[in-house]
Amino acid sequence: MKVGNEFSLTEIVRADSLDDIESARSLFKEYAAWLEIDLCFQDFEKELSELPGEYAPPDGRLLLAFVNKSLAGCIALRKIGEGVCEMKRLFVRPEFRGKRLGRGLAEAIIRNAKQIGYKRMRLDTLPPKMNDAIGLYQSLGFKEIEPYYQNPVPGAIFMELDLGSESPAEARASLKKGPDEPAT
C-alpha cells in the first residue's frame, strides 16, 4: 500500500525477505527499549530469535512502514485462538510520529486479519505510555475487555475488535460514498 504527496511517500509492505525480517527485529528492539519494560513474560528474546515465527503466513502477518524509503514503523498479528488474532508490536519511530503512520499500520493489519478470515482481533496496551495508541484503538472500534492472558505489568488494558463489523472510520467513509460506490 502506498500513500503520499509531493513531499513524502509512505509505503506499508509485508516483511518477506531476510532484510525485512532484520528490519523488523531492529524495530522490535527499539520498541522494547522505548517501553522501558522487561518483556521476558512474553518470551521476547525467543520471539526475536525466531522471527517471523508466529507472525508468518498463513496465520500471521508482519508489516513494515517506510517513509521516503526510510524504515519508519512496524506492526504484526498472530493467531491466538480459533477465529481470534492478536495485534502486536505497533511501533513508529519517534521522528515519524504525528503523521498518521500508526493509523495506517493498524488499518493495514486489520485488513490483513479480515483477509485471513479472523473474526476478532485482540491487543493489550499500557497507559499512560501508550495513551495515543489507546485513542487510536478506540477510534478504530476496539473495546476494552477482561484480560485474556496474565500480564504482570500493572495497569495493562486489554481490547478487542469485532472484525465482522465496520469500524467507526469505515462507517464514516461509507457515508461519504455514493449509494453505488463500495466503501474502501
Where are these regions (language model features)?
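Acetyl-CoA-dependent GNAT
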Residues: 15-88, 93-94, 106-108, 112, ...
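Active-site acidic-Proline motif in GNAT/NAT acetyltransferases
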Residues: 93-99, 128
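Terminal substrate-recognition subdomain of acyl/acetyltransferases
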Residues: 2-6, 155-184
